[in-house]
Structures are given as structure tokens and as C-alpha cells.
Amino acid sequence: MFDKINKTLDFNQNLLNLYAKRQEILSSNIANADTPNYKAMDINFKDEMDKITKKSNLDITLTKTSSHHLNPRKKNFFIFEVKPITSKEIQSNGNTVDMNRERIEFIKNTLKYEENLVFIKNEIKNIMNVLKG
């Protein structure tokens, strides 16, 4: 039972990390909308989601270089592949940021992040109710 709970929470934690990283990328694109030659970036959400589902990157281990370092209990490390967005519209200064796309993706990503937080909150609430009896 606890293994299933742990897997559910780990999956959702990794999903939150993915949404947070994407939010950083989208924010950077918006902030650099007027920067000459800036290339808009993003992650392929489906590919990164597949990595989380398959847990292919969870085997990364840390090396202790000091006896004062803590031993990691969880392997929750993902290396997200950030790629330039192929844009149909390139500004005269070489910038490829499409503000309409960035705003829409930013809002969608924010809503998905919040939705996942609510899901985790409800899962924890349900677990607490079961434990209380």
C-alpha cells in the first residue's frame, strides 16, 4: 500500500518539477522578447513526460566528496532537454519569440501546475483520512 502511495507522490513531484522548469523557460522567453537574436526555447513536454513515466533518469547517483555530505534517499534528478522553438515569424532583429504563443503556454503551464498541486493535496488529505480511521 505504501509503495503505491510513494510511487504516486514521486510521480507527481517529478511532474511538478517538469512544470516548474518549463515555467522558467517560458518566463525567460517572455523576458527576452526584445533581445536581438534571442532564440525562443522550450522542452518537448511529451518526451519529458515519457522519461518520468519510464523513470529512465532515476538511476543517476551522487558522489560524496566529504564525510559531512548527506546520503541521498531519493533519486529525483531529471535532465530536461531544452530545444529552440522553430518559429515561422522571426523579427527583424533575429528574435524568434512569439509573445502570443508564450503567453498562452505560460497560462496553460501555470494551470497544469496548480492542478497537480491540488491533486497532491487531495491525495495527502485522503491518506490522512484513511490513517485517522
UniProtKB/Swiss-Prot annotation:
Its main location: other. One of its GO terms (cellular component) is bacterial-type flagellum basal body, rod. Disulfide bonds: none annotated. Keywords: Bacterial flagellum. One of its GO terms (biological process) is bacterial-type flagellum-dependent cell motility. Pfam families: Flg_bb_rod. It is found in: Bacterial flagellum basal body. PANTHER family: FLAGELLAR BASAL BODY ROD PROTEIN FLGB, FLAGELLAR PROTEIN. Structural component of flagellum, the bacterial motility apparatus. Part of the rod structure of flagellar basal body. The basal body constitutes a major portion of the flagellar organelle and consists of a number of rings mounted on a central rod. In Gram-negative bacteria, at least four rings, L, P, S and M are present, whereas Gram-positive bacteria lack the L and P rings. The rod consists of about 26 subunits of FlgG in the distal portion, and FlgB, FlgC and FlgF build up the proximal portion of the rod with about 6 subunits each. Belongs to the flagella basal body rod proteins family. NCBIfam families: FlgB. This is Flagellar basal body rod protein FlgB. It comes from Buchnera aphidicola subsp. Schizaphis graminum (strain Sg). The gene is flgB.
